[in-house]
């Protein structure tokens, strides 16, 4: 394929009884895209090592090749436009189990029909991408308001349990919000940390779970003050449990200082 575009939809696409296995990185996913277009096949499934399970289908390991990944990524903007490039890149952060297959199906359609494909929101191969984006945007909006920090030896630390991998999307907000602080946000679900220290931010993948130290006495006092403040704001006669659940779903409560006690 040295003299060809990395994505060439000219030949007829076929469903293949094969499972792609890749390393879970975005570059690795781009190599899955390359393989799918090179073989003109839609795999039965696309797995990462964490999602690998027993199957009767042959498993094809897709190694991460940085040169191939760059070629595929460059073709997104060159042939499909910036909007498609942004949507695919953002949706890769989704927590949907079949996100890779959804994205590849869309890309085959987009390269066949052109840059306007992303506008066809009602198309069955396009609609799921906007559903993934909506889920991402909703979680980002919620966590921008629901992240609760505790001080640990001069550093602020927070724990979150998002369904989607949203740390890259939270980075700009919290770095701008606390430019002079050192802080970390620990994503338990995806075993990753957003670390901001000495005015520099980095995303770290963890090899094993992280345990934050317990808050000291001063921090515990501040937390108790915050809980008391939250309680004094409530007007019991106007309590609307359904409305509260809508604006602050229960799955967020375990990581929120003022809500933890209500889970007991």
Question: Where does each model-flagged region fall?
Answer:
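Internal, well-folded beta-alpha domain core
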Residues: 116-206
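Long, compositionally biased intrinsically disordered terminal regions
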Residues: 180-182, 192-198, 210-264
């Amino acid at each position: 394929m040295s003299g060809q575009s990395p994505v060439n939809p000219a030949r007829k696409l076929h469903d293949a009884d094969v499972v792609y296995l890749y390393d879970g990185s975005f570059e690795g996913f781009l190599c899955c895209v390359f393989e799918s277009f090179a073989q003109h096949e839609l795999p039965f499934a696309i797995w990462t090592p964490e999602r690998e399970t027993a199957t009767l289908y042959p498993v094809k390991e897709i190694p991460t090749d940085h040169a191939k990944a760059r070629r595929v990524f460059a073709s997104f903007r060159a042939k499909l436009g910036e909007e498609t490039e942004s949507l695919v890149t953002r949706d890769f952060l989704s927590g949907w189990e079949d996100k890779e297959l959804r994205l590849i199906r869309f890309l085959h359609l987009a390269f066949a029909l052109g840059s306007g494909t992303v506008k066809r929101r009602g198309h069955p191969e396009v609609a799921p991408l906007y559903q993934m984006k909506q889920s991402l945007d909703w979680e980002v909006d919620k966590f921008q308001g629901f992240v609760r920090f505790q001080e640990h030896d001069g550093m602020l630390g927070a724990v979150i349990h998002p369904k989607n991998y949203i740390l890259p999307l939270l980075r700009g907000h919290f770095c701008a919000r606390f430019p002079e602080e050192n802080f970390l946000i620990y994503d338990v679900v995806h075993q990753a940390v957003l670390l901001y220290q000495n005015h520099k931010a980095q995303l770290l993948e963890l090899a094993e779970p992280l345990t934050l130290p317990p808050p000291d006495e001063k921090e515990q006092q501040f937390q108790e003050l915050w809980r008391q403040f939250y309680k004094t704001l409530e007007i019991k006669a106007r309590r609307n449990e359904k409305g509260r659940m809508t604006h602050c779903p229960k799955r967020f409560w375990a990581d929120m200082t003022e809500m933890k006690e209500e889970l007991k």
